[in-house]
Each structure stands twice: as structure tokens, then as C-alpha cells.
């Protein structure tokens, strides 16, 4: 694995995992970077973003995970076996279960980095009746620049294969409907995914999507339930 690329992944992970940003707690969240046409590096299962080390990053083969997204059904055991088989180094740690959607998102045009967090300010909205409207609206011009005109919205699904398939389905639908590639994907009752050309771009998008709900003392109108 390229030392510089992995170092940039570690730096992003430490920033996202830090207490100041309040984007994750304990083992929440994960990050990944594309290494080349065949492989990517992703946070290992059971590791912590704030303290992520090189040994907590697992290199995986796209070809061993992407076909799983086309299966109509797979048991938890089969998914675990696929995750273990995807490791380039069999001695490395098992990749996160969410490596499945990282593998897909890293194949999108221009995407070389993915960050997934459970930001408290945003999750307050994603766990509300106005979650979908939050994905469709923007509160300030900078949010449009960093996060796009709207976000992909994914209805709640249990983490694992089902969620990864739902993400792919909604991204494909979004691109077809808007003609644009997404920057932010919002997962109902779960969290945020940012995709970008670099760790810096991903960090910027995640900071910006959290800005409106964090800075406004009065929630935007799409958060407040109509009477």
C-alpha cells in the first residue's frame, strides 16, 4: 500500500474521530481510499477512527466484493466469508462490514475517497420525519458547492449487504434523475457518507453538511413538522 495514501487516510480518520467534531463515538464510522484499479484500503472491523493505525487498515480487492452486490440473497456467514476473502493479505484484519458500500462508491467517476460518520447534529434530522426533505434542501450557497444541489437519500436498512445494495440502487437512481454524481449520501436513522476525489474533499463535504443543523438555533423549516 502507498505510504502517502495510507497516511492521508489515517489523518482523515483521526480528524473525523476526534471529540471536537462530534461525528462518531467509540467504533462508529469508517473511511476508505482507492489504491489502484484493483484494490482499495478500508478501516478494519473493530477499529476506532480516532486511534486508527496502519495495522487497522485492510487492503481489499474490488473483484471479490462487487459481485456480492448482485446476489439476491446471502447469509451473514457468506458475507463474512466474502469480506475475509477480499483481503489482499490474508493476515490482515477483517474489513468493516460496510466495506461493501465503500467498494461500490469507490468505483464512481472521480471518487478516490469515502468517509462515513454518525454526526450528532445531522442524525437529529435523519432520525426525524423530515429526513428526506433535509436531503433535498440546502440552507446556504456554500452547502451547494461542497455537497451538491441535493443529497442521495437512502431509507433505513440494516447495516450489511442490504444497506449496500440500497445505497447502490439510490445512487443509480439519483444519477439517472439529476444527471449529476453525488457528493453526499444520507442514510435514514443512521448517518452520512461523503465521497470525493481526496480525503480533503471528503472532510470538507462532511463539515459542510453538518454546518446548517449545527449553526442554526432555530431548525430550518424542513425539519419542523407541519401542524
Model-predicted segments: where are they?
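Glycine-rich flexible loops
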Residues: 1-227
Amino acid at each position: 500500500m502507498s505510504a502517502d495514501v495510507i497516511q492521508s487516510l489515517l489523518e482523515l480518520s483521526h480528524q473525523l474521530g476526534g471529540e471536537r467534531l462530534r461525528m462518531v463515538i467509540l467504533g462508529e464510522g469508517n473511511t476508505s481510499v482507492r489504491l489502484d484499479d484493483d484494490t482499495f484500503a478500508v478501516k478494519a472491523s473493530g477499529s476506532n477512527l480516532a486511534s486508527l493505525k496502519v495495522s487497522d487498515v485492510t487492503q481489499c480487492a474490488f473483484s471479490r466484493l462487487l459481485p456480492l452486490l448482485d446476489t439476491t440473497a446471502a447469509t451473514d456467514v457468506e458475507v463474512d466469508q466474502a469480506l475475509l476473502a477480499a483481503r489482499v493479505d490474508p493476515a490482515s484484519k477483517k474489513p468493516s462490514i460496510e466495506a461493501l458500500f465503500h467498494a461500490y462508491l469507490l468505483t464512481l467517476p472521480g471518487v478516490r475517497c469515502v468517509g462515513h460518520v454518525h454526526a450528532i447534529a445531522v442524525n437529529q434530522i435523519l432520525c426525524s420525519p423530515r429526513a428526506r426533505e433535509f436531503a433535498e434542501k440546502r440552507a446556504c450557497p456554500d452547502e451547494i458547492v461542497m455537497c451538491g444541489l441535493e443529497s442521495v437519500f437512502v431509507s433505513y436498512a440494516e447495516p450489511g449487504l442490504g444497506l449496500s445494495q440500497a445505497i447502490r440502487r439510490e445512487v443509480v437512481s439519483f444519477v439517472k434523475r439529476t444527471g449529476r454524481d453525488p457528493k453526499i449520501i444520507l442514510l435514514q436513522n443512521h448517518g452520512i457518507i461523503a465521497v470525493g476525489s481526496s480525503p480533503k474533499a471528503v472532510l470538507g463535504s462532511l463539515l459542510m453538511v453538518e454546518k446548517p443543523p449545527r449553526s442554526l438555533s432555530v431548525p430550518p423549516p424542513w425539519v419542523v413538522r407541519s401542524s
